[in-house]
Amino acid sequence: MRIISGTNKGRTLKAPKWDGLRPTSDKLRGTLFNILQTRIAGARFLDVFSGTGAIALEALSRGAAGATCVESDRRAAALISENATLCREADRCVIIRDVVERALLKPLPGGPFDIVLLDPPYDYAHLDAAVGNAATQRAEGGIVILEHASRVIPPQPDGLALTRTVTSGDSALTFYS
């Protein structure tokens, strides 16, 4: 796992040493940031179900103004902190260790956000609610992105328009505005 582009290009990130985390592949992360390239500079980025922090750190490397990571697992939150330090981004990367459902119900540091990304476990049962609650963290004109299993039909929460879905192998990215 590495940072693909930007100021930290090529930097290797620490990976989890336990089962249960599914880091986004470098290929899918590259696809995501190719799509976001015109929006990322100066953006406020929210990474929900952050895992290793690789997506938030990629955003910072490519010019995002700041990133907030929400992660419930204490080991993963510690890993995000280690990776942010490795990338010299600890000062621009806020880590919230809390249950996602609770964290999204209150204003988060660094928000409102221009880009909100959710990468829940593929068997997560509350996609509709998670996407809808994450959307409340959006700045005006901001977007919400959901990474999910390509076999799953993406949710259509009230107040959001599904604008695009991109599939790569077993994974998909669905964009909402």
Where does each model-flagged region fall?
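Class I S-adenosyl-L-methionine-dependent methyltransferase catalytic core
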Residues: M1-S177
